[in-house]
Amino acid sequence: MIEVKPSQAQGSVRAPPSKSYSHRALAVSLLCEAPSKIENISRARDVIATINAIKSFGAKLSDNLTEIKIEPPQRPSIPDDVIDCGGSGTTIRFFAPISTLTEGGYTVLTGNDSLRRRPMGPIIDAINKLGGWAISSRMNGLPPLIVRGGGLKGGEVEIDGSISSQFFSGLMIASTRFERGLKIKPIGELVSRPYLEMTKEVLRRSGSHVELNEEIKVEPVPPKGLEFKIPGDYGLAAFHMLTASVTGGKVIVEDLDSTVPQADYAAIDVLRSFGVEVQEVGSRVIVEGRPKRGSKLNLKDSPDIFPIACVLASFVSEISEIRGVAHARVKESDRVANMASELKKVGVEVKELYDGLVIRGGSPKGGVKLDSHGDHRIFMALLALAAATREGCIIEGEDSVADSYPSFLEDSMKLGIDVRYNL
């Protein structure tokens, strides 16, 4: 655990590489017909799981820490061992359909305790409906998963869209190698749709063809090869923007690119909705000014911003309503319940709804112990909260930041946040 003393964030910081684009670029590069080169790739623990996965399927990597070159196999090979996805839902949901592309045999995909509680039913059902074979080893729709190889012809499939868009992205990538391509029809409301735009962008750059309308159509055009510099991650950089705001500081975040699709660009709109001053100057975002008013938000398409919105709402006396995130209950933790419990510890009025929170904030009290519940995004949000209290707070679970942003605490301290270790 760590102790965060009252602090004010000041200075500049480079945005970490996008975790979402790193996953997509690596998965697509495995299926390319020619070598790929990826620059500025994330070194987060979740992305390392994806790097290890493409190696297990036969990709050969050359890594000089600035760029990774990927030599793909002719087709994904049968892994020699179980694919350990760690805590990465993206990894297991992308590589379950990719596992159908091996010449034969079976692939077993599993992960840590958190991952083994995350639902996989939609991707299991989709693979089976398309003529493949996939099961949950415990027959409960949760990992471990067992997937048979041999290839899929493709065709049409319906998928429940209410849990995660990762199922759709995984099928979009894998289906570039299906014999007939694929048409996917979402059932119900499709959450996190902007992430599909990110998947489409990577596939487009590699030479594949995707249509995103009410239905998703993927042509059977294998990716040719990918050269891609991973942009900065708006969603992760937004935690420094949050800290700047609630501590009354000023932070400049560099190396962001709003010209490529980014689901978590929504963080900029969320900050502004609370009255925070945000300037965008080229590749820089400048944030200063405390939150001034409550906000009513629907974060259906950007659930990872939910903890940030909750902390902003905690520092304004007006009521805020943050909804549309029922699917945030099945992330690395139940983010709705866990954010509610932690905000109550610092005296914030919270009403929990099935799909979000109603929050009346003010001046959260410090001097308490907060728990990140092993969730990296909750931890980063709580650090901002703790720094903005008069007494500071102790926070458990700092190791979780390695999942997405290994240098988060180091970067926070460079901005002036007083973090104490060895408690």
From Swiss-Prot:
Gene Ontology terms describing biological process: amino acid biosynthetic process; aromatic amino acid family biosynthetic process; chorismate biosynthetic process
PANTHER family attached to this UniProt entry: AROM/DEHYDROQUINATE SYNTHASE, PENTAFUNCTIONAL AROM POLYPEPTIDE
Entry keyword set: Amino-acid biosynthesis, Aromatic amino acid biosynthesis, Cytoplasm, Transferase
Disulfide bridges in this chain: none
Location in or out of the cell: Cytoplasm
Top EC category: transferase
Organism: Korarchaeum cryptofilum (strain OPF8)
Ranges in a coiled coil: none
Assembly notes: Monomer.
Catalytic reaction annotation: 3-phosphoshikimate + phosphoenolpyruvate = 5-O-(1-carboxyvinyl)-3-phosphoshikimate + phosphate
Protein name (Swiss-Prot/TrEMBL): 3-phosphoshikimate 1-carboxyvinyltransferase
Classification via Pfam families: EPSP_synthase
Pathway membership: Metabolic intermediate biosynthesis; chorismate biosynthesis
Protein residues bound to phosphoenolpyruvate: K19, G89, R118, Q166, R335, R377
Family statement: Belongs to the EPSP synthase family.
Purpose of the protein: Catalyzes the transfer of the enolpyruvyl moiety of phosphoenolpyruvate (PEP) to the 5-hydroxyl of shikimate-3-phosphate (S3P) to produce enolpyruvyl shikimate-3-phosphate and inorganic phosphate.
Annotated 3-phosphoshikimate binding sites: K19, S20, R24, S164, S165, Q166, S192, D304, K331
InterPro entries assigned: Enolpyruvate_Tfrase_dom, Enolpyruvate_Tfrase_sf, EPSP_synthase, EPSP_synthase_CS, RNA3'P_cycl/enolpyr_Trfase_a/b
Example GO molecular function: 3-phosphoshikimate 1-carboxyvinyltransferase activity
Gene3D superfamilies: Enolpyruvate transferase domain (3.65.10.10)
Active site: D304
GO terms under cellular component: cytoplasm
EC number: 2.5.1.19
